[in-house]
Amino acid sequence: MTRPGARTLGILCACLVLLGAGVFAGVRWARDWQGSVTLLANWSGDEREQFEERVIEPFEEEYRIDVVYQGSSALSQVLAADIAAGNPPDVAVLPGPGELLAYAVDDRLHPLDGLFDPGHYDRFWAPEVTVPGEAPHTYWLPVKTGLKSMVWYTGQRPTVQSAASPNRWCLGMESGATSGWPGTDWVEDILLQQAGPRVYEEWANGRLPWTDDAVRKAWTTWADMVGAGAGERVEQALTTGFGADCAPGRLEHQGSFRAGHWRQAGGDHVHFSEVVPGAGPDAGAWEVSGDLAAVLNPTPEAERLIRYLADPGTALPEYTANRAAKADGEQDPTEREIGAVLREPGRARCWDASDAMPRTTRDAFHQAVLRHFAAPEELDERLAELERLREEQDLPVCGTD
């Protein structure tokens, strides 16, 4: 018997793969679709698979609406290009309200009034926003949320004193097109714990100068805590991905998305205020993040998707801000605690400030922390550059509802 050669087997495998893809495409084409909706977001890998499995596939099955998903790590650039070309997605999911506010002011977003109950959310998650010439409207809905202001550790619980050495910290600043955001998280969180939510909200809304003493103190505190300007350490952190594993005994200032990693390491977390030098009397508020869905093309299919995302019975990935949703029974104690902080009334929560800022300011902030980390002696120049970009706006950045 003659055995097939490697080339023959390779061709056969390729044909089978193409046949399988064709069958899958044929199955999707043969479905009795009642319409379609385009969705732009930045989820990829496991995050995208989880969203498709828990949200998109059940939605398609129930409503016979084909969700055409477009994922991109350069989300802001792709969306801006699509809008400029006159071909925006029906629904876009962006990480924060600052960029969405600009699109609302430019009359690019369509109100979500009547599609869901904003009372199921803290006001700052799904606020009524007033744009020039319009009555107040709700323009976005939180799809998934994350908790920040967390310090992960193993072993002994950290304190201000034990966290004072830069060598204690695990730090990765690289994140592709958005490199620098781990550093902005530090500066923001330090300001929140040192100066409190009121000052923080004024700053995030462009009503407090970047050159203010409280803001400057946050930058210098961060530089001291992480060893800014130390050549080898700086080079390592600038080229290390934000999700890289930490060496044993290190501390990590990262959000709830790292819970799985630290659970496997046998770790725990403390609130960031416990390790920040100079934490003020209003310390203890939580910095939070979220992916927000907005409608750019108000088709019936797009509105149906928004209703589905707001339904308390929809199994959204990770953490929902919807107070009417039932707690996920499969979550471990740490995950349940995180979910409670994100949803329960009475908790002081503030948006990640850079995500609440206009896009130009946010991007400049990312670059400024990278440059400050490498050359902390040039702080005056960095703050002056950011001050020239400061724009006042009116967003509910903090809340306790």
What is the meaning of each model-derived region?
Residues 139-143, 162-208:
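Extracytoplasmic/periplasmic solute-binding protein
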Residues 76-88, 106, 163-165, 237-252, ...:
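Short helices/loops that flank or line small-molecule/ion binding pockets
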Residues 343-401:
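Conserved C-terminal helix/tail region of periplasmic/extracytoplasmic solute-binding proteins
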Residues 180, 201-237:
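Glycine-centered hinge/linker elements that transmit conformational signals in sensory
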Residues 97-149:
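Hinge/lid segment of periplasmic solute-binding proteins
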Residues 1-99, 389-401:
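Conserved N-terminal structural module of periplasmic/extracytoplasmic solute-binding proteins
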Residues 221, 226-301:
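Extracytoplasmic/periplasmic substrate-binding proteins
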Residues 286-360:
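Mature extracytoplasmic/periplasmic domains
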